[in-house]
Amino acid sequence: MQQVVNEKLIEYAKKYNIKLVCTNDVHFVDEENAEAHDRLICLSTGKDLDDPNRMLYTKQEWMKTREEMNEVFADVPEALSNTVEICDKVEFYSIDHAPIMPTFAIPEDFGTEEEYRKKLTEKDLFDEFTRDENGNVVMDEAAAKAKIERLGGYEKLYRIKLEADYLAKLAYDGAKRRYGENLSEEVQERIKFELHIMKTMGFPGYFLIVQDFINAARHQLDVSVGPGRGSAAGSAVAYCLGITQIDPIQYDLLFERFLNPDRISLPDIDVDFDDDGRGRVLNWVTEKYGQEKVAHIITYGTMATKLAIKDVARVQKLPLSESDRLCKLIPDKLPDKKLNLPNAIAYVPELQEAEVSPNPVLRDTIKYAKMLEGNVRNTGVHACGTIICRDDITDWVPVSTADDKETGEKMLVTQYEGSVIEDTGLIKMDFLGLKTLSIIKEAIENIRQSKGIVLNIDEVPIDDPATYRLYSEGRTIGTFQFESAGMQKYLRELQPVRLRI
């Protein structure tokens, strides 16, 4: 069929004076990978190797060299020339990009970018973004110019400055709610320092977005939100914005563990929502920023050593007992070496015997398992990572779709996995669903219905002697982060009587 199509393509190209190009359908890298690819197709289609009706390829789908392509298409040299022409036009580019911060809608009565462009000069911005929070010069001119460039130039700085000022307003409003109208010098200095770091690293928009969906979850969607976890708990600004419920000043937590200008990296705030409400928060975010601007992150499941053996053995119909025997020969770890099939074979004599076995099915199982080990076996969706983009996601990265397990609807998924996404500059937010929060929420409702008491979990005292007795006895089954046998044992040894960090 392909031959017939090719002949017609050549005919039409000449008839209508259209340039013809030649391509090669590539599914694997080298010619010797053809048989391994054949077995991979059997796995993906659920067929056995000896099934006459299974999907078959020509085994010519390796990435051919220039010489091989010239030989295959020797009868249409003009198509080869046209292909080279396209190749010469392909532009090399890097996917690495500065952070692509989503646009947070700031009320116009607070200020606009246009107003900021009129009232601020580039010199004003240069000084503000390259000096410390007290206006002191802290870097030479070359380093200062490099920093302005890294932030996206003055065109971006006007937006960052507007977001930073609005963030400061929200932070100080929140600080008065947390600490009272008259802020202590310590609180003022801490907030001033943190806001300056957030601004000069280019991240005020990030905090505006996070506080926005957290406050929407709490006050609009009736979703329980965790008090905060990880290094974000060290931020007083996050505490004032309602992102966290832990006072870092009271507990002497370090902000520098969270954001540090000497270690340029995107902020990473893990936000816990109750299991039942997480989906509602994601829907709210999608509706606010647009379906084309919000995507989940793909995950790639690869074939581990034992799985590669089992999969190849299955399609080749190696007896299950023999497949199990091979898998049991794989050690859990190897001394001073990475655990993979070639290293395991070098370490285990029985695997060496299987590799040269007179039984061709056994021998081929080892041979092709070695080739397929580490290959992508399936794809999934990151449990909590979600991208919110300034533009349509497709403007920046390739996407696919996946089924939402909760709603059954299609959702966008990036084709780059998490380790690559940060390099592209896309902003990842972590929306975690926590069963513990659902249980606490249900308990509070049960107390309200049975006792008539309206309980605020954020105001529960942390100095209750009866609670500490439970912890000291290790009676923490079902308690988040304290339910493992090891933690219960440690609590019995520690005998905690107070909470201090």
Model feature map: region roles:
Residues 1-501:
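Alpha-helical scaffold/interaction cores of sigma-54-like transcription cofactors
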